[in-house]
Amino acid sequence: MKKLSLLALPIILAACGETGVNVGQGVSMTAALIGTEVGADVVNVYAKNADGTRGAYMGSEVKVYRPNQGSLNFQVKAGSLGMTITSAKVVYTDASGTPFASPSNTFNTTLNIKVPEGYVCPGGATTCTFTEKTATPVTFTAPANELYLLSEQAAIAAADSCVDGSAVLASGQGACAEVRMNITLTGQDTLGTTRTINIPQAQVRVYVATVTEEVR
């Protein structure tokens, strides 16, 4: 019986040591969305005079919109647990906080983004035991193919905001809306606890990318 106890003791200690390092740990990280934008290719439309020449300005139209999801970056503090982000809720507003792209101003989407923990293995190794890891701040950028926070409806509404038909348009900001994204990321940390990360007022740059003319 005494022999059995001696054999069991190292197993119990090993189990306690492995889980003990996580007791009291939490997720300590921040996230930022940068570079999100919508470019609009616009055509200025003019009336055709009887002789076929260009007449009066009739208005402008968006021919093509070009969305860019941007880059979702994380700053993970040393010793933080990792996190797998599984969903996002995005609320679109203008710069004053008024809902934008209604009734599609709220967008829910699924994600699969694995944010690493705030530890690194020696020598840049990809795997090692926990006792070999060192608590270190980690910078992480979500894979572009996993990122979908700017919905098609919001992108179209943003591009359309550049055109009101009242004046001839030129390339640049113009009268385009100032769009903001208020994002709540939800997922589970390394221990399976549900966590949320908020990104308030992420800016969407909306601009007139190119301008052409048509006489009709």
Question: Where are each of the predicted segments found?
Answer:
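Sec-dependent signal peptide recognition
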Residues: 2-9
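C-terminal motif of bacterial Sec signal peptides marking the signal peptidase cleavage site
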Residues: 12-15
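Non-catalytic macromolecular-recognition regions in eukaryotic signaling proteins
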Residues: 17-216
